């Protein structure tokens, strides 16, 4: 083989071997080299596409012709690029041997082996740096004939004779001990005894009596016999005394019997037992072993050369050299290519415009679009945007940079700068096109961040995530594997459910609170919680507790840590989160929010009061009698006037009246008072507010309301009305054998006695309301009835005035009732009596035909007008006390004639001996004035009112009068011939206001109008007078 080929062969073998180095070898380093490549690139080039149709009339303007179209087509070109790549080589002090880098000793180890760069390990019997000397201890020199000049049995180097002084002795001859305050090899360390002396060899402190401790920093307590010092060990710098061995275990960075000696260069860790692995001049920290690389190198072992474009400590500096120049990685000095010089390699060796070895060839570049030409070959350097051999061609579209040879080829998310085309790489990538990952131990943007991993193989170039060794987690690999992983590199997945963690060594699951089982797949049983489900729930009213924290899950209506508190008033539901909507003092159930209303209210939200007549929590019916009302909350009865007792069922006791029966009656001569308004009901023959006045002349009877029938100037008995005739006269009036025709007419007491009329008018004017009540009370007291009655009286006697006749009515015309209007009456009979006179136009249409009496006497029937409705339905049953219906009819009879026209079945026809009047229709109010007496008895004049509901309205309960509880007793037959039919009456204006309220739901009826209010529908019935007749029988109902 020729000699020129040998160097090439060795270089090829070296490159081949360099390519086979193992990158995981701790002694393998890397460097960057540049290389050029010729590639075929594609780019778009614009072309003008001419139109296919010719321009037919170009003279009309170019805008009328079809225009060419610009299209882009892909073309290819050859480009030469310079790039850099990372290559492996053995670190400084090492060389490659069979694929591995082994240490290199500059001097061959004669009788030993090279264990580190320039460090030999000699076999026994040999000494020296290269293990070539066999001098005995204490001798040195080539012939081993020179004694060492080292004292205290110190050894010396067998070649140089330099003494190796042990700890505590000063060089060069090891004869003098260390200066006080210093210790160790070559006396290079200061004592750490707080001013106290130390052992020159070990550095152990000699503490005074009052202090103790490894560094004399613990004070002793003084006693009677001196100082008492606590027992301490002698290990310094955090060393731990090992009792079994009786020695100190030193922390990282320290060594020696008491841990007083720092680690020598090249060692680190506990007891300095670990060897440093830093290359290329890097130093390791004696505590952590982390390498501090020399400028120009990086990596955890300082094995990598700084990337191209970076230099300095930890490759943190950026090179500031021309694009084609490289910088020295240690200090950043630029390494210029041929033809350039200067700190940045930007200065041309040739003057501008020339190039070549002698700088005599002129440049051919377009000066306007170029920078210059290369000083060696004359190649033009075009300004960005221009290309061509002479920089006179503009760059095609989508190209940039000098010579238009660059495309934005930024990979892995890199962004291309619009002006220069430089790529701003994404984190973890570097290079012109962001094609390369960050160098080892660097990551992030521009690979500027240093990895901080411990116990790791490498770190991610993107985010610095460490690839850890077995049992260590990601991050800086200083703690166990993260949750969910275990094993080598934490690549085994934990089989633990519900966020449980597993042991980084064994993978055993440690369950989170609330779960148990081999894989933490089972929830805690009900009633248990916490880690291992070992805790039991402490809840009162709950559906269990949270399996993790044990928080009680309260049932609706409960709250508190233990669900032991009921919801506060006004709240309800789960966690008492709902607000009650109960009104009027109602409360809600904490479980479901249902309202519990306060007494007197009802409804879902207690929004409605109890209906009238009801009270209490459930609006139960009131227990109050006689139409009294009760308090809606507690049901207390409020009695109407005239009633008393807890339930208002007891009438006022005799002699009392009014609300709560608190008033005392003021009635005399045996008169009784009305229990509601206190008005006196006088006995026969007495009148006045307090029954203190006797009947005036010409009157008699109850309240002196009946006129005497004894003739002018004659007296009558004030109680019975019997005439007190003068001698020679008898009868009533005091005339004998005089037949007077009967006249049906309205009469007043004035018609028979002027003095009585004047007194009657005065009494009516002053006591209208009282008279009504007195009359009703008197009737009740006289007859023992439960209801007041309407009376139709007969009156004999003739008054001057117009006559009226009641036309005959066939016998079949029976059972009539009236409509609400004024009507006129006529009297008719088969044998009409003498005509009767009625005064004035009041009854002008009524006639009085005479009718002879029959065998049994006169049978006079007053026939109602034709507009009174005919009623043929069967008579109803007995009068219902619960009904207030009033039937308006009119009939009278005092013989065994055809019977009355109107009969409701309450009185048999043969028993009917008196006229009957009742009211029924829509008419809400009716009055009957001046009821005349029947023949043969004293006359009575009275005033009464009747009320009843309108037809078609629901029946209403009649008022319960004060004497309704009395037993009915048969009354002596009055000779007045008056028959009374029960009907609900209103006594006076005051009693109207004292009536109990209507039942709920009934509107006020027409009959609730004030009495004697002459509105449409009011009418008066004229009194009727008839000839004397046999005494009538009365039927009590």
Swiss-Prot record:
Glycans are attached at residues 152, 271, 476, 575, 634. Residues 824-891, 926-1037 are annotated as: Disordered. It is found in: Cell membrane; Cell projection, Lamellipodium. It is a single-pass membrane protein. The modification Phosphotyrosine is found at residue 925. Residues 1-20 form the signal peptide. InterPro entries: EGF-like_dom (IPR000742), EGF_PEAR1L-like (IPR057138), EMI_domain (IPR011489), LE_dom (IPR002049), MEGF_diff_regulators (IPR052485). The keyword Repeat applies. GO terms for cellular component: lamellipodium; membrane; phagocytic cup. It comes from the Eukaryota. Expressed in umbilical vein endothelial cells and platelets (at protein level). Expressed in coronary artery smooth muscle cells (at protein level). Expressed in heart, kidney, skeletal muscle, pancreas, ovary, breast, lung, brain cortex, hypothalamus, spinal cord, dorsal root ganglion. Expressed in umbilical artery endothelial cells, megakaryocytes, osteoblasts, coronary muscle and erythroid cells. This is Platelet endothelial aggregation receptor 1. It comes from Homo sapiens (Human). The lineage of its organism: Eukaryota, Metazoa, Chordata, Craniata, Vertebrata.
């Amino acid at each position: 083989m020729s000699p020129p080929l040998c160097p090439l062969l060795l270089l090829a073998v070296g490159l081949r071997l360099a390519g086979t180095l193992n990158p995981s070898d701790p002694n393998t380093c890397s460097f960057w080299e540049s290389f050029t490549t010729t590639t075929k690139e594609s780019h778009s080039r614009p072309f003008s596409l001419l139109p296919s149709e010719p321009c037919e009339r170009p003279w009309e303007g170019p805008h009328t012709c079809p225009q060419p179209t610009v299209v882009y087509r892909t073309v290819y070109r050859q480009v030469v690029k310079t790039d850099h790549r990372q290559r492996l080589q053995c670190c400084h002090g090492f060389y490659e041997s069979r694929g591995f880098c082994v240490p290199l000793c500059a001097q061959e180890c004669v009788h030993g082996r090279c264990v580190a760069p320039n460090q030999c390990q000699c076999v026994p019997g040999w000494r020296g740096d290269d293990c070539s000397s066999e001098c005995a201890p204490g001798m040195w020199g080539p012939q081993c004939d020179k004694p060492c000049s080292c004292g205290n049995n110190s050894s010396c180097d067998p070649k140089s004779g330099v003494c190796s002084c042990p700890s505590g002795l000063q060089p060069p001859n090891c004869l003098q001990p260390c200066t006080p305050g210093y210790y160790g090899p070559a006396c290079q360390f200061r004592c750490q005894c707080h001013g106290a002396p130390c052992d020159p060899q070990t550095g152990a402190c000699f503490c005074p009596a009052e202090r103790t401790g490894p560094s004399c920093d613990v004070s002793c307590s003084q006693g009677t016999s001196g100082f008492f010092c606590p027992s301490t060990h002698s290990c310094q710098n955090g060393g731990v005394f090992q009792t079994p061995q009786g020695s100190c275990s030193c922390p990282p960075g320290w060594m020696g019997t008491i841990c007083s000696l720092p680690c020598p260069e090249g060692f680190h860790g506990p007891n300095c037992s670990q060897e440093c692995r830093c290359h290329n001049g890097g130093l390791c920290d004696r505590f952590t072993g982390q390498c501090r690389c020399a400028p120009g190198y990086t990596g955890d072992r300082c094995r990598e050369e700084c990337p191209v474009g970076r230099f300095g400590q930890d490759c943190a500096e950026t090179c500031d050299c021309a694009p084609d120049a490289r910088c020295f990685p240690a200090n950043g000095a630029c390494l210029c290519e041929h033809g350039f010089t200067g700190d940045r390699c930007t200065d041309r060796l040739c003057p501008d415009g020339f190039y070549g070895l002698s700088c005599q060839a002129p440049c051919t570049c377009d000066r306007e679009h170029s920078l210059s030409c290369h000083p060696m070959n004359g190649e033009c350097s075009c300004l960005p945007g221009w290309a061509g051999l002479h920089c006179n061609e503009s760059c095609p579209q989508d190209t940039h940079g000098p010579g238009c040879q660059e495309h934005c080829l930024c990979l892995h998310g890199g962004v291309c700068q619009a002006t220069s085309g430089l790529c701003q790489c994404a984190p973890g990538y570097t290079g012109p096109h962001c094609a390369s990952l960050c160098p080892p131990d660097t990551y992030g943007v521009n690979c500027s961040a240093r990895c901080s991993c411990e116990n790791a193989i490498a770190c991610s170039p993107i985010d610095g995530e460490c690839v850890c060794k077995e049992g260590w987690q990601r991050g800086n690999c200083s703690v166990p594997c993260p949750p969910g992983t275990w094993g080598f590199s934490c690549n085994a997945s934990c089989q633990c459910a519900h966020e449980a963690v597993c042991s980084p060594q064994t993978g055993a699951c440690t369950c989170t609170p609330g779960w148990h089982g081999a894989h933490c797949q089972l929830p805690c049983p009900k009633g248990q919680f916490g880690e291992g489900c070992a805790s039991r729930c402490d809840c009162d009213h709950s559906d269990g507790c949270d399996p993790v924290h044990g928080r009680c899950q309260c049932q609706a209506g409960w709250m508190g840590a233990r669900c032991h508190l009921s919801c506060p008033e006004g709240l309800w539901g789960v966690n008492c989160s709902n607000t009650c909507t109960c009104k009027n003092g109602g409360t809600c159930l904490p479980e479901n929010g249902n309202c519990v209303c306060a007494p007197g209210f009802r409804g879902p939200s207690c929004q409605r009061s109890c209906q009238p007549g009801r009270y209490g929590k459930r609006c139960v019916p009131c227990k109050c009698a006689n139409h009294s009302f009760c308090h809606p909350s507690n049901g207390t009865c409020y009695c109407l006037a005239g009633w008393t007792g807890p339930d208002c069922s007891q009438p006022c006791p005799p002699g009392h009246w009014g609300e709560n029966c608190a008033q005392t009656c003021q009635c005399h001569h045996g008169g009784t008072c009305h229990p509601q308004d206190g008005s006196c009901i006088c006995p026969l023959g007495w009148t006045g507010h307090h029954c203190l006045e006797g009947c005036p002349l010409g009157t008699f009877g109850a309240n002196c309301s009946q006129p005497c029938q004894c003739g002018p100037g004659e007296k009558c008995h004030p109680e019975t009305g019997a005439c007190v005739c003068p001698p020679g006269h008898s009868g009533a009036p005091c005339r004998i054998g005089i037949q007077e025709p009967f006249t049906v007419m309205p009469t007043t007491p004035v018609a028979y006695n002027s003095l009585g009329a004047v007194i009657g008018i005065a009494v009516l004017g002053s006591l209208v309301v009282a008279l009504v009540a007195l009359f009703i009370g008197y009737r009740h007291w006289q007859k023992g009835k439960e209801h007041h009655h309407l009376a139709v009286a007969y009156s004999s006697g003739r008054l001057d005035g117009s006559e009226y006749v009641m036309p005959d009515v066939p016998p079949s015309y029976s059972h009539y009732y009236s409509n609400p209007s004024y009507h006129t009456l006529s009297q008719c009979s088969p044998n009409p009596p003498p005509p009767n006179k009625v005064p004035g136009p009041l009854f002008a249409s009524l006639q009085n035909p005479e009718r002879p009496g029959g065998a049994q006497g006169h049978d006079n029937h007053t026939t109602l007008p034709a507009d009174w409705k005919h009623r043929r339905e069967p008579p109803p049953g007995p009068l219902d006390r619960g009904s207030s219906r009033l039937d308006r009819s009119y009939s009278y009879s005092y013989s065994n004639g055809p019977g009355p026209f109107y009969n409701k079945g309450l009185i048999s026809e043969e028993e009917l001996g008196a006229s009957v009047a009742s009211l029924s229709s829509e008419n809400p109010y009716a009055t009957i004035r001046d009821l005349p007496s029947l023949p043969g008895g004293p006359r009575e004049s009275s005033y009464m009112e009747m009320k009843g509901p309108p037809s078609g309205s629901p029946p209403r309960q009649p008022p319960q009068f004060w004497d309704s509880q009395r037993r009915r007793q048969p009354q002596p037959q009055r000779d007045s011939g008056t028959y009374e039919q029960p009907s609900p009456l209103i006594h006076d204006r005051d009693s109207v206001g004292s009536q109990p309220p209507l039942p709920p739901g009934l509107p006020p009826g027409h009959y609730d109008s004030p009495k004697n209010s002459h509105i449409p529908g009011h009418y008066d019935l004229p009194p009727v007078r008839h000839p004397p007749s046999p005494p009538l029988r009365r039927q009590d109902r």
